[in-house]
Amino acid sequence: IVIDGKALRAATEKIKDKKAPYILNAMDAATNLVIAQIPIPEKTNEMTAIPKLLEILDITGSTVTIDAIGATETIMRMREEKKGDFVQQIKKNCPATYQEIQNIFEGLEEEKAADPKTFAKENTERYSEYSSCERNRERVEYREVKCYTNDYAIRKIREELPFICSVASSCQVRIPREKDADGNDVTPDKETFLKQGSRKCPKPTEGDKLTDQIQKVGLVSNHTLTAEEIARYKRDHWRIENCLHHVLDEDFLEDKCTARKSRNVLSVLRKTAYNIIRLMQIDAREDREFVIDVIDEITEDFSAALKWIFDPIPSFY
């Protein structure tokens, strides 16, 4: 379950210093279905709304991911008490925990470099690494995750968060794609980019912000996981941006809707329509002709909506 907030920018009241209203969404990453939403009250933020959203969800046996704003003891403990698992990003907004994670993995790197064989033997079941490379039209992304599950090593973190079982360090390098005059790909490799940058990005920045080319974050979980599993959960967290928020703005024009008093109701209606389409896509295995036939059937007889929209929902759970 992925939880993230989304702004309704066009619904902002035309008053000086008035902030855009926000909706907090919860999405099932396996099916891309929206399972809950609550409006974020004015003069508050996601941090106060997240516990209210968690309260109405049954997260038993589910893994809940939230961006860095969910890295508070209260929100992590609530997920633990509701019998859910979590993979939580830790950024510099939690300086003590962030630095402790960095210290743990810097120490592990020193041990590994000093005596690789002994390190591998002693940490076979506790330490894992995972790396991947993804290419798209705009950039090449290298991702590396290291995970450690040694109780003694993470004892300082467990003093405050006793339910933590795994800690991880993630490094993501984003390199802008480049082509020469003939259209050939001349994007530098990871090592070259880290040493001297590139033509488009001569001085790569490092940090935990989306604008940084080199992003480093920590992660913690109340479940014993491998580096590959944590990397997958971290990657899946972005599905809510790509599969839900982008679709709401581009296809449903949510970001251009100026309705104010009815904005929350309209948001529910948009997500109901979104879920209808997602359910039909799942059932049809993305067969476009099938989707058109179903829409025609529902138009002629709305009771058909029960068969295609509501009856299949329990089968996913």
Please provide the spans of the model-predicted regions.
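Short, surface-exposed basic-aromatic patches at helix termini and helix-loop junctions that form
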Residues: 76-84, 106
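Short hydrophobic alpha-helical runs that function as membrane-insertion/retention elements
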Residues: 85-90
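An anionic, glycine-rich sequence signature occurring as long contiguous blocks
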Residues: 91-92, 96-230, 235
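Short amphipathic alpha-helical "interface-anchor" segments enriched in bulky aromatics
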Residues: 220, 224-258
